[in-house]
UniProtKB/Swiss-Prot annotation:
Keywords: Antiport, Membrane, Mitochondrion, Mitochondrion inner membrane, Repeat, Transmembrane, Transmembrane helix, Transport. Mitochondrial ornithine-citrulline antiporter. Catalyzes the exchange between cytosolic ornithine and mitochondrial citrulline plus an H(+), the proton compensates the positive charge of ornithine thus leading to an electroneutral transport. Plays a crucial role in the urea cycle, by connecting the cytosolic and the intramitochondrial reactions of the urea cycle. Lysine and arginine are also transported by the antiport mechanism. In addition, catalyzes an electroneutral exchange of ornithine or lysine for H(+), a reaction driven by the pH gradient across the inner membrane. This is Mitochondrial ornithine transporter 1. GO terms for cellular component: mitochondrial inner membrane; mitochondrion. It is found in: Mitochondrion inner membrane; Mitochondrion membrane. It comes from Rattus norvegicus (Rat). It catalyses: L-citrulline(in) + L-ornithine(out) + H(+)(in) = L-citrulline(out) + L-ornithine(in) + H(+)(out); L-ornithine(in) + L-arginine(out) = L-ornithine(out) + L-arginine(in); L-ornithine(out) + L-lysine(in) = L-ornithine(in) + L-lysine(out); L-ornithine(out) + H(+)(in) = L-ornithine(in) + H(+)(out). Disulfide bonds: none annotated. Inhibited by pyridoxal 5'-phosphate as well as by mercurials (mersalyl, p-chloromercuribenzene sulfonate, and mercuric chloride), N-ethylmaleimide and spermine.
Length: 301
């Protein structure tokens, strides 16, 4: 059975959802530490201190605060990302004058991934806003920035809607876009470049699970090294906006540099780098294998 664009899009969307699920289940505790250290750099002396204090204050469940919105965020983001990635690859082929079935270069794949990420950011921003607020709720309450309240996904969603309406879910959209668009150029570029290295003349589709995971991990490292300061600014905007203060990208950046120094923009980098390999490796492994399985089932029909 010959694939059509709608079926191909559905396969990419489903495979992206599988990849997003694998990414969260693998890396959620490190993501929680990252957001805490980004938002409250003066509160923790480092990753170990953040882990120990989180465990003593909230228990093991503290590492998995925000998992539900993180799952929704990653499933939504990666579903849209990989579905749009397929469409954007076709757009790149058209722009450079290639046949629909022609293989793209690593640079062209990176450009397609960058374009696709702009669409993914629109579904990611609301769910990531809820996730970041849940992850830092304990620190916001104990520091006196907000009053003690229910700490659930639904309570956070209701509070955002009550205070700011539907547009309130898009606090930090500009910084999310500024992170996603260049970041995913390096993400897909690093992934495809690494796959080309491991394939060394063979088809990339023949790579086993270990090279795929290493390639995904390398792509994740490339992404975070390129845009980490922007992610730090985004976390600040999304978390601190629950106090009622609305600060934009430039003002938040200038405030951090002026009051805390440039190094504050890299708070939480260590857990992010530790998380990058297993989480993004699992993402691409789940994506590639589930996509391959669905494509083989389709061709057998």
């Amino acid at each position: 059975m010959k694939s059509n664009p709608a079926i191909q899009a559905a396969i990419d969307l489903t495979a992206g959802a599988a990849g997003g699920t694998a990414c969260v289940l693998t890396g959620q505790p490190f993501d929680t530490m990252k957001v805490k250290m980004q938002t409250f750099p003066d509160l923790y002396r480092g990753l170990t201190d953040c882990c120990l204090r989180t465990y003593s204050q909230v228990g093991f469940r503290g590492f998995y605060k925000g998992t539900s919105p993180a799952l929704i965020a990653n499933i939504a983001e990666n579903s849209v990302l990989f579905m749009c990635y397929g469409f954007c690859q076709q757009v790149v082929r058209k722009v450079v004058g290639l046949d629909r079935q022609a293989k793209l270069s690593d640079l062209q794949n990176a450009a397609a991934g960058s374009f696709a990420s702009a669409f993914a950011a629109l579904v990611l921003c609301p769910t990531e806003l809820v996730k970041c607020r849940l992850q830092t709720m304990y620190e916001m309450e104990t520091s006196g920035k907000i009053a003690a309240s229910q700490n659930t996904v639904w309570s956070v969603v209701k509070e955002i809607f009550r205070k700011d309406g539907p547009l309130g879910f898009y606090h930090g959209l500009s910084s999310t876009l500024l992170r996603e668009v260049p970041g995913y150029f390096f993400f897909f570029g690093g992934y495809e470049l690494s796959r080309s290295f491991f394939a060394s003349g063979r088809s990339k589709d023949e790579l086993g699970p270990i090279p795929l995971m290493l390639s995904g991990g390398f792509g994740g490292i490339c992404l975070w090294l390129a845009v980490y300061p922007v992610d730090c600014i985004k976390s600040r905007i999304q978390v601190l906006s629950m106090t009622g203060k609305q600060t934009g990208l430039i003002r938040t950046f200038l405030s951090i540099v002026k009051n805390e120094g440039i190094t504050a923009l890299y708070s939480g980098l260590k857990p992010t780098m530790i998380r990058a390999f297993p989480a993004n490796g699992a993402l691409f492994l789940a994506y590639e294998y589930s996509r391959k399985l669905m494509m083989s089932q389709l061709e057998a029909c």
